[in-house]
Amino acid sequence: MSNVNEYNDIVAFHPGYYIADIIEDMEVSQAEFATRMGTTAKTLSQLINGQANISNDLAKKLSAMLGTSVEVWQNLQNAYDQKLIEIQQAKDIDAQAELVKEIDYKYFVDVVGLPKTRSINDKVANLCKFFKVADLRIMLQPDFLVNLRSSLSLNSDKNIINSRAWIQTAINISKDIETQPYNAEKLKGYLPELRGMTVKKPKEFLPRMHEIFAECGIAFVLLPHLKNSGVNGAVKWVTDDRVVLAINNRGVYADKFWFSLFHEIRHVLQQKIKKVFISSTLEEMMDINNKLEIDADKFAKNYLISPEDYRRLAPSRYTSDDEIVEFAKTIGIHPGIVAGRLQHEGIIPQERCSKLKEKYVFEIKKMNRQILGKDEI
């Protein structure tokens, strides 16, 4: 170990660096200097080479021997320690720099009001503070956010950091949403009303939806898409009686929105408190081979369109727009949900009946941690 540490333009001089100069000026050997100082040759050698720090006892001996104050040596040690911290911080920031480049910082400026900056150092500092982590690389660790359960094929740091950033953002925003203690029976009782909202416009159903979820112990967060996150929705229990349910609002068609919502509702009802569920695309949610995900998938499909009703429709590749609209009307659901189901199951081509699939536009205002709840859309 050296008694001088350098990184970029930061230089840290260990007190041993100055002691070596003093020994040279005194024209004595290290052994003699150690004897005069009242310490061992080994201790002095470690001190000179930066392998040991100045203790209060050594500072006292040096001050008496050289006619300085004790504080001189203590200050040299403190200055060195501070420089080491600066060096480590600089190294940490440089190590996080590549990770920051994978994150759309502007998203956090627009969505949660982080300060605008072009400085990588500032971006790292601002994101660490927002995510409440000492280092962004912590968010790559397998246990970050506790027992992550994902239907997503996350195989790159870019995907992992952004998916977890999106979830943590939803959790942070949810802190401003007041909820009652979680009540599963109350939530089940509201399911018919939630299903009935499928025929309404977002500006009509969202305020009531927020109220229902809050009453059931669910902080519902509708959050803009974060590039490279691949997240469509997520469920995270923050306490035993409070859960965050977050949905991505990117290019959401009615069928995908409602399938995603009821998929996540099922995860809430599963009440696996120690797990975090992440759902990606509609296709992945419906195809994943996992018991809990299969259960959520089955629940969403069957609650929106019951098996009995689906058999009654007896869909075929010749099913027309008018038939879908009429069927949807009889079961009280948005026709786009029926069309989306038929497309996904390959009964009708993707281009067929697409005009029935209404695209929702959620205008989410600039927020400071508060996502649209009671505000108008």
Q: What residue spans do the PLM features occupy?
A:
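Active-site hotspot residues in diverse enzymes, especially metal/ion-binding acidic/histidine motifs
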Residues: 2-377
